[in-house]
Amino acid sequence: MKSIYFKILILAFMASSLYSYAWGLTGHRVIADIAENHLSRKARREIKKMMGRERLAYWANWPDFIKSDTTGAWKQASSWHYVNIDPQTDFKAFEQNLKAQAGPSLYTQVNTLSSQIKDKNTSEKDRKIALIFLIHIMGDLAQPLHVGRAEDLGGNKINVTYFGEKTNLHSVWDGKLVDSQNTATQNILSF
């Protein structure tokens, strides 16, 4: 059964990426807040039933936090945070490349997670986890270095100096841009 509120959630996340300049902790929370601010009443009710009283921003970083889990319980989700593409690829070649890749990616998981959330036969716990991941990976999908070349590991192999600090391009884009502004989340949301 297709539900309009999930379509609205996905559209809100996609729209939020237009206003997002970085992702890290602050960026993921801001993206989730922007998406939540654009939900219909029906979508908001349905998500509240599933998630409880916490805002979407509360859960937005959980998929990054569990990457450090040493039990291996979430190992299969590590590839959900990015997709490798050749920058000279058109969409048709991109789709063929995805089919040739082993395992899921950020791009393929959007549909998989959306289907799990909509499937009433999926347990409430699994639907909640799918929504938490969807909240997070929609932000990752909008971050240019999570959709890029495998050779530079999403900018992790590109060394830069940012305000006198040696770091890498991914780190700058993922958090330092927003965090260095010392701007309250509320101010970011008003852009």
Positions of predicted regions on the chain:
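Bacterial N-terminal signal peptides that target proteins for export
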Residues: 1-8
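Residue-level micro-sites within transmembrane alpha helices that shape
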Residues: 6, 139-142
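Sec-dependent N-terminal signal peptides of Gram-positive bacterial secreted proteins and lipoproteins
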Residues: 13-14
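N-terminal signal peptide c-region/cleavage motif recognized by signal peptidases
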Residues: 17-19
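N-terminal, motif-rich segments that launch catalysis or mediate targeting to/interaction with membranes
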Residues: 21-137, 144-191
